[in-house]
Amino acid sequence: PFALTLGARGSDVLHAGGPDRTGSAPITMDGKAVFRFAVDALPKCLHTVLDETQLTLDDLEWVVCHQANSRIIDHCVRALKADPAKFYKNMDRHGNTSAASIPVALNELAETGQLQPGQTIACIGFGGGLTWGGMIVEYKK
């Protein structure tokens, strides 16, 4: 649903060979399509990992989603009728840190003392190729 290309000063440095390109090649993404995908995938993924582990949302201390967009997480919280306090967000401080967003969030939770040994966390991500995945983690210091 979206294509990625590059066009900016220095873009020739990123060209790794192959046919010569001419013209502009800006990075583009169909944000609305990605949003629709994410707000559908995140709750499905969470339900899948909870079902597989025979847990419920109430069994989790934290849900750490890919930190792509605060509105995506807020939409999922509403769709799940969940407690927003369980859904960790740090985009206001770091923005979208791409593939590192879940590890960065987990580290931040641990370093600030909000993540305690024995707590159960769902990590739910989505990304390139419109893929998604999740896991349940029990934190051990």
Q: What are these regions, as identified by a protein language model?
A:
Residues 13, 37, 41-49, 59, ...:
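Non-catalytic alpha-helical scaffold/packing segments enriched in small hydrophobic residues
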